[in-house]
């Protein structure tokens, strides 16, 4: 984007924005929750809608002058309904966490019970962690993945639900590399008369493209982020059956938020339209193919993957066996110095702290947006392996950085008519 006016008004911010643009162009984004939106989405999110308050919903606003805002939100809803097939969709949440908050506010009372996946096993802060409002407001018990396989043990989850009797069971995760069997979790919820919240923040795009099974029509509530694998404007979304529509809408506004960020809603609408194009299905499948190629190549280098591989957009690497003296933090910092940006991550059975854990998480959505295929991701895996094998060797880091530079030049950002790399 052109920051000419920002440069005139605020050179310091303009410099930071330019630095971020250059950073994204010149490094490989492998944080599994990140992606590169199109220039069309960027423009929509920087539109004059940022000036407009639009409290309420289309046709029922608390302020005048909301005609264009109504048009934008209605288009976002219509496109979301076409993508995911839910009976009712609210596109106003500012984030995936606030989408989850809306469900809790709508359906639970303080002290009610939540059953969710343990954070170090791949869950999320907003699913009941003590540092989050959920852990401070509700009674939370958490399930874990099988320590031997790294998979969710659905039979064990069912038994745990019967013993705990939760009011809501949360599925959907931030660091779980396998396909989620939503129907199995729904069976556990039905057995104890609990609600089922499926948080698909990481896999919204995979679900929309049909390359991951959908919880819509299975779970009572489906929430997600709109800027990860779906590659739309930043924010959140809530989906539910029509019977819960009024409760959810009231929980979003005025329960959890005031005016929606209408410029972000515009970005959502544009991104949803892009995701309705045939090439998006090819993109989503390529994300998975790339993650599989990345993981398999890392295994060839001797790395251990949680669950032994991946079915989705991410791999979770457990360094304890292959590199017992190298923490996820050391690996993250060495890789960033080489131009590969991923994140340290806890692993099941974690023996270190969350700030210096034993694993790293790597995702392929942003690489795939740049046009990476399986062979390119294998090259990335080779670089990752070499750096982690030699995290303190400056020569290794310099060599890796040169390889990353070559990949960034080979697969530049914002190519093609849609503003992202086109897939034929």
From Swiss-Prot:
Site description Plays an important role in substrate specificity, residues in chain: 227
Location (main, coarse): cytoplasm
One annotated Gene Ontology cellular component of this protein: cytoplasm
A single BP term in Gene Ontology: tetrahydrofolate interconversion
PANTHER family hit by this protein: SERINE HYDROXYMETHYLTRANSFERASE, SERINE HYDROXYMETHYLTRANSFERASE 1
GO molecular function, one term: pyridoxal phosphate binding
Record has Phosphoprotein as a keyword: no
Pathways per UniProt: One-carbon metabolism; tetrahydrofolate interconversion; Amino-acid biosynthesis; glycine biosynthesis; glycine from L-serine: step 1/1
UniProt keyword Transmembrane, yes or no: no
Keywords of the record: Amino-acid biosynthesis, Cytoplasm, One-carbon metabolism, Pyridoxal phosphate, Transferase
Enzyme Commission number(s) of this protein: 2.1.2.1
Gene3D superfamilies: Aspartate Aminotransferase, domain 1 (3.90.1150.10), Type I PLP-dependent aspartate aminotransferase-like (Major domain) (3.40.640.10)
Binding-site residues for (6S)-5,6,7,8-tetrahydrofolate, renumbered to this chain: 119, 123-125, 353-355
Protein family: Belongs to the SHMT family.
Protein name: Serine hydroxymethyltransferase
One Pfam family per UniProt: SHMT
Physiological role: Catalyzes the reversible interconversion of serine and glycine with tetrahydrofolate (THF) serving as the one-carbon carrier. Also exhibits THF-independent aldolase activity toward beta-hydroxyamino acids, producing glycine and aldehydes, via a retro-aldol mechanism.
Organism expressing this protein natively: Natronomonas pharaonis (strain ATCC 35678 / DSM 2160 / CIP 103997 / JCM 8858 / NBRC 14720 / NCIMB 2260 / Gabara)
InterPro entries registered for this protein in UniProt: PyrdxlP-dep_Trfase, PyrdxlP-dep_Trfase_major, PyrdxlP-dep_Trfase_small, Ser_HO-MeTrfase, Ser_HO-MeTrfase-like, Ser_HO-MeTrfase_PLP_BS, SHMT-like_dom
Cofactor(s) this protein cannot do without: pyridoxal 5'-phosphate
Modified residues (N6-(pyridoxal phosphate)lysine): 228
Subcellular location: Cytoplasm
SUPFAM superfamilies assigned: PLP-dependent transferases
Catalytic activity line of the entry: (6R)-5,10-methylene-5,6,7,8-tetrahydrofolate + glycine + H2O = (6S)-5,6,7,8-tetrahydrofolate + L-serine
NCBIfam families in the record: PRK00011.1
Subunit description: Homodimer.
